[in-house]
Amino acid sequence: MRVPVLRLCWAAVVLAGGLMVDSASAGDTLVFDPPHPGDSVKHIVLISGDEEYRSEETMPMLAKILSQKHGFKCTVLFAFGPDGADYIDSNNQKGLRGLKSLDSADLMIIATRFRRPDAEQAKHITAFLDAGKPVIGLRTATHAFQGGERFGDSLTYDQFGLKILGEQWVSHHGRHKAEGARSVVEPGVESHVILNGVSDVFAPSDVYGVTHLTNADTILLRGGITESLDPESKILAYDDRNKPMQPFAWLHPYTIPNGKEGRSFCTTAGASLDFVDEDLRRLVVNASVYLTGGQVPEKADVGYVDPFYPTFFSFINDKDYYKTMNMKPEDFGLGKTPHRPDPPGNPAWPFRPVPEAK
């Protein structure tokens, strides 16, 4: 069974002024060139691969916005099935391919969970970090890798989140799949450019516990536990779990031995469903521009380039699910919109776009 992919009429997806250009899929990667390529264009590599939060949906959507509306070249990486399979399999912790793309990257956006790249793939992450290049971590990037293998001589896979992003896996701070999270700006940083045009992030995936940040970190947003998964639900003002609210987005300085000092941005939001929220998309776009030395717009355009139909976050225990879906990188190219049913057993969430019934 092939996952349904909605191919849009080209006239319907071309924006005024010829904004959109075709995307090129080179083997296992998905590449989006900007409308006006050139030597000064910055390159972002977006790495998907997690078992629960559908980063394989999120990263192509963000790459389209960053490339077509903000002038970046974007390369999206995926996890694939075992034994050289050509289908995307986000459950395969050893399935990452294409990390060589980091050799020419100016920014890495990562949303993986407990990945175990082999030494040949890992060396590209090592070189990227040794150069002190910037990193954006989404949601499970706090536990992006697992195991005692190393990036270079001293940074184990297990240490990536804590050392590079400032935090590791701690806990779910709200009731998962029952309570969401709403952002509150940290006092004193209201004028930070990463918050330009960002008013109110709501994430149905909830907020993580965050306990390891230090005075070297700059907290931009805190996340308050909300009454429900409804985007209009209020923060539980008198709940002790919101005293204090957990850090939700922050900047972190990192250094690894033999490497230069670098900077990272992390948010514990990041399920594909969370990115229905325009303010979250803007937060990540702003951080991308900021970390690559650009001028952050007052209110960045973060409208979808193609329709976006995220599925509900959930672990998928069917070992044949991804093989049956048979999704390929090119299914996420420009003018294409994959759509899958939610995994069974999840709550209804009618606050997202869905394809029109035929």
Segments (PLM) and residue ranges:
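A glycine-rich, often tryptophan-bearing local segment used as a flexible ligand/cofactor-contacting loop or short
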Residues: S101, I110, F114-G197
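Catalytic beta-strand/loop cores that center a nucleophilic Ser/Cys/Thr
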Residues: T29, S67, K73, Q93, ...
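Nucleotide donor/acceptor-binding cores
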Residues: K42
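N-terminal secretory signal peptides that target proteins for export/translocation
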Residues: M1-V5
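Helical hinge/lid and interdomain linker segments adjacent to catalytic or ligand-binding clefts
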Residues: L30-P35, V45-I47, E51-A144
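Bacterial N-terminal signal peptides
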Residues: C9-D22
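Extracellular ligand-binding/catalytic regions of CAZymes and related secreted enzymes
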Residues: G27-D39, E57-T58, Q68-K69, S228-K358
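Oxidoreductase and adenylate-handling cofactor-binding alpha/beta cores
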Residues: I65, T156-G161, L165-Q168, P187, ...
